């Protein structure tokens, strides 16, 4: 309202000044208009006059400038009549004068690019402002400016100038300004209304570049609102010009035809069914065209590789008077120039689609069009720029056809059908529909054009592409979303404003900004400027190896980016030491494009200038690898890659899979993590310009983008906190596969619940708080009752305990550390706040458990063994466990354990009754009643449980149950005692339900433990006389509160004796017999001499019948037997020195005679054995085979090495009788084999039962004398069956032996 009132109240002075502004330049009009408005704010009349005079002077100066601009064009402007556009000059100038916007359509060569600016200049549009003329490429802007200046006969940079990125040839007198569309776009930021221009020519609009489409959209808004005086001329090839007209309210179109000749179109589709491919189709087309007559051929190809393959195939054709010329963007300037300098030979030009509209290849008569091209297309799915090969549009196909109608009639061969052509889209999609829009969106937002969706583009971009552009800018930190009353609004951040200031792609700009934080701005400016241009390193087709060797000097082992830094340093050194021409030649030798090097340097200096203007610090110290690549990474977060196992590819953002491009230094190395400057899809998705990175660099840069997921949180006792495994991903790439994190900060509620349950309820934490220890003690007491009674209903459930703590503990407590802080204050108010009461832990309906039924200790003699209870069905130690200290294992007997503890005894008896076969079990139904009756009568532990049970059941029912009928396998494991042997710290050594098995397996360890607790000196070795103290028959030692009992004995060491402690009295007895015998033999004269003197010759000869080695060994066996007899005759073992001396004298006195006596008996045994063996060697009937085999087995068991001592003196006569019985059996065998067989079967049955008994006996115990006697009872049975006439030692039968065996 204030501004409008000012306008309506202009003073006469102001009105006078405003009336003079129409004749001065637009920029001056805007500047002075603001000053004239300012006069109205000055109160002093005198001051107003002074300012007005100053403004008047500036108006005069501005008028003078306009006059100078008018007079700058002195010569008449010439328009070449040969150009089609010149012939329409009057019509075109009339349209320009009458309309704000016009569209000029014409093919390349019509002259519109060079003549339209001259027409506008002639109309005077250069007087009050510049005639702006945009070109899609920098080289075109420079060359067109030079051409127009030449035609106007003026110096470049004066009347005609140009401005491209980082190169400005403009002066105050410039009226025609050539520039790239990117320059005009950048100028809009500082000159939003384009006041420096009176006319704009947007050339090559048909290319539909992103910049051009944005400029046209911007002008669509600007012209009718702010710049009705601004003229706009849109030039285009004859492609979809109506679209431009409609965009500007049906602006008039004038079509200027180029100089063209008729072109014949021939369709020669490649037929796959005929095994014909595109290359063969091209070769066929070349043959067909050469047959038409001489003329240059232009063949359109998809890319560099196809061009080289086709060139190689054509060279093999040996075409006469023909040269083959490639044309593509990466080609060196020298090779490109060959196209424009005919050599006189027929030329075949192989070109990419750059030759469609942007570049005129002269003298083309024929065109071969395969109908495809690589078209840059943004993939919404993968978020990468693809370069797929696609069928070209009809408009592009017609442009290609038009290349050959310029100099004469031409022929265009299309390698596809006419139907294919007619089915194709009419026009190629504009760039805005197939590219990432991040840069445009950033610039628009910086210009205040926030509503991108409403912006009047010629063709509105895909909404998804807009969102992707926004997401990329969010990735770079350029945008932030704020909540307003009207909803969410996207605002430019400080970083975003800085990105918009830097004249490079947003990704590259982000790298420079990040370099500030990492101290590598200098290096980043070099790399970013290199990434902004085409690679200056050239690789000519015929010199690939040589160029590769030159470029390899600059390579870095880990990064393609660092090659630019190395190259930059090299170029700086070369420039210092060389003149300009020398440097140019050196670049050529090094296969470096000189113009691109200059462009690189120009861009670097422009970036450096911008960086300084933004006051960003530039480092002077050299940056390290990590600094540089972390800064690069900040702009390439969606271009990271994780190596996939066993594949030559990487997992990229959004599940993309890409490979490293073959020209990378990392192509063969394939590190685990990489980043790529760009991802481009051709035959596959390639990562170009790659470097090795570390995953830990990523997360700090991508905090706003990463996603975190967590495993199920668990309590960590060691950390005293709730921990979860965190997985960190960036666009789906796992940058942290797994790491433990404190879950308390992530979800306090869940963490508090887990803390209470795991730490307080379940006890899983390390703490010294008194309340907790007391609570745990009370819980253990109640749990022990549950284990004892094998019930789960005594202790209150975890939920009750959880609620107890939950109601009392602060909500902020999520870990042990938090608890300690809270409890320090809380206990001051109520120290017993968290204490359990015993009654609180017991369920109201739980029955009481008697300590008598479930004792804590088992008493056996003087032993007191700890009992523990475990109610864990299915586990090894389910039930009652007896804890036996290792040194006491030898003292514990199985006696009594079969009765179980009182609390389980009834259940055990019931289970035993139910284990009986049905024929017996039915006599004791119901089993619980009989179990109760049995327990009321029996005296526990007095006799073995089964013996007592058999007796009582027989008393109650009259039914006798045999021992073998009880099936212990069916008895539940918890009813069987578990024996656990423990070390001195109570730690388990071994565990089993078989006590004898434990004793056998741990025998050596028990022996070691007994020796370990013995007094020094009690165990000895290397003794030859009784030089030691009296031996106690039982040795006891206290250890850790229990009595360790052992049994010392003299042990045989062959040449000496020793003293050793044994676990049992039986082991002591066996060892003492051998040890005492050896000590006596060491202290009495040997009887061998006496034996030689007194033994009859016959007896001596008989001894030689021994089949067991040396006769001396047999004699030693006899002597040992004699000593054993004398010890027994003396009264047994002696335990002191005095007793030993008496025994020694007794043995010395009687040893000779007893030895001779034994030797004579042994001679008779050996002689008889020899005779029997001789009889067995004779011929026998086959029917006697089983009997003879049995006899041989019997003889081997009677007479063997060491049989004399082992049998003993009293058994020798029996051995002789047993052998005589064998002789009688052999006599009878021939008479009645069947009778022998029947008797042998009776013996075999008894022998088999005896062997089963031996297998069943505990391994930990030696065989008792009683069991050993059964072996001789079987020999007596043989005498009774085979030689009854010899008589037996006592009454014997197989039944009697069976009854004795069954008792075990």
UniProtKB/Swiss-Prot annotation:
InterPro entries: AAA+_ATPase, DEAD-box_helicase_OB_fold, DEAD/DEAH_box_helicase_dom, DNA/RNA_helicase_DEAH_CS, Helicase-assoc_dom, Helicase_ATP-bd, Helicase_C-like, HrpA_C
Ligand binding (ATP): 106-113
GO molecular function: ATP binding; ATP hydrolysis activity; helicase activity; RNA binding; RNA helicase activity
Keyword Chaperone listed: no
SUPFAM superfamilies linked to this entry: P-loop containing nucleoside triphosphate hydrolases (SSF52540)
PANTHER family in UniProt: ATP-DEPENDENT RNA HELICASE, ATP-DEPENDENT RNA HELICASE DHX37-RELATED
Family, as annotated: Belongs to the DEAD box helicase family. DEAH subfamily.
Name the UniProt record assigns to this protein: ATP-dependent RNA helicase HrpA homolog
Organism: Haemophilus influenzae (strain ATCC 51907 / DSM 11121 / KW20 / Rd)
